Amino acid sequence: MRRLLVVFAVIAATLVPVGHPRAALSTDAEDRSVPLRLWYTSPAANWESWGLPIGNGAMGGVVFGAVNTERIQFNEKTLWSGGPAPGRDYTNGNWREPRPDALQQARRLIDEQVQVDPGPITALLGQSKVGYGSYSTFGELRLAFGDLGPASDYVRDLDIDNAIASVSFTAGGVAYRREFFASYPDGVLVVRVTADQPGALSFDVQQTIPSGRSNAQRTLSGGRLTVAGNLDDNGLRFESQVHVTAEGGSVAPNGQVLTVSGADAVTIVLAAGTDYADTYPDYRGPDPHARVTATVDAAAAKSYAELRAAHIADYRRLFDRVELDLGQELPALPTDQLLSAYGTGTLSPAHERYLEVLYTQYGRYLLISSSRPGSLPANLQGVWAEGTSNPWGADYHVNINLQMNYWPAEVTNLAETAQPLHEFIEALRSPGRVSAREMFGADGWVVHNETNPYGFTGVHDWPTSFWFPDANGWL
């Protein structure tokens, strides 16, 4: 994924290259003559560069594709440290002590010196962050198959046309296939495991618990694994539920895992949530248990075919609004080899055009996957983050990065994806009014260079970026 997750808007902003004589835009993409697909012949070596991202706006997953142990790292967009917490003086970034003359002193310095080093200004107006927090991984869903032996015919791919990732290979004379998608209509991540021989599927299903969740507990019952607890940092309540349905064979609790034995096919659904609510000043809502349970119950009651069909129909309702024709032709090279060959003169022009079209439509795919109504907007990493403390907190930089996420929304006919951004801006007004009054003695509202889901509208102490009181107008 590299930093496509940070700047995917730039990809789609170049939807119609200027001056290319064969560029054409179509709004009817029911039957694509050239399929859009990322594909590789080996498992992902690392999360950022090679993992395959799936998402439904609120949740995201990254598929690794290892033969013996499949890993799906997953996120839920409201799982954030920081914000209000018992014993924490969280002021939304507003000054923790009155500074009645700070603005006047800063203005005098600028008037007197014209060019002022940012350090003294930061000392007057900035302060260290308290409770800013970070977006965090929810954990990993792992499928442990044991040693299947040497694999052949290995393919790992992401079907951009239908928003489905897959892994297929042959081992021990058995052809295995796994499919993965994130369903917006059903609110779950879905995994399907099949084999071409009856009773060939036996594996353990487990979920990891990252650090900073000392009271998290696993509960297993029937074919369901529940992980619930609170973040140590702020007490945020979280819960995920995994439901495993085996066709043929059996599934049963086995210590801390669910064990599938002798199955023909297996469907796994995963939902997650927290008690976060975008409401100032507490930013808390109901315990997620009832909501997560209802979501998993409803999805588990459906067949895999029903879940898959609903997902594809929902996704293509958005994605199929735009088709880009640059005269491209489908190359036979895996995507990593295609990237390496691009611009070297070894590809035909039509094959290079294919990569350009794929790159553009991948940007639209990432926006659809990371921003849908009903959750927070896409952050610095969309909806995908591997760690518990991510670069820049995977926050919302409102100087330009947040806006960049949504550059493709209107111009590539994905206006609905911007609704979370509009609602997020509206929610910033309440804490922003307090910042305007306490810091400037002014009406209206303000937000500075960056913010988080907890209404951080004040300042920090990085001299190069702490002061940007007109950011709300820039939004």
Give the positions of each predicted feature.
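Extended, hydrophobic alpha-helical segments in both membrane/secreted and soluble proteins
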Residues: 401, 468-475
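Short, surface-exposed loop and linker segments with low hydrophobicity and enrichment for Pro/Ser/Thr
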Residues: 3, 260-262, 472
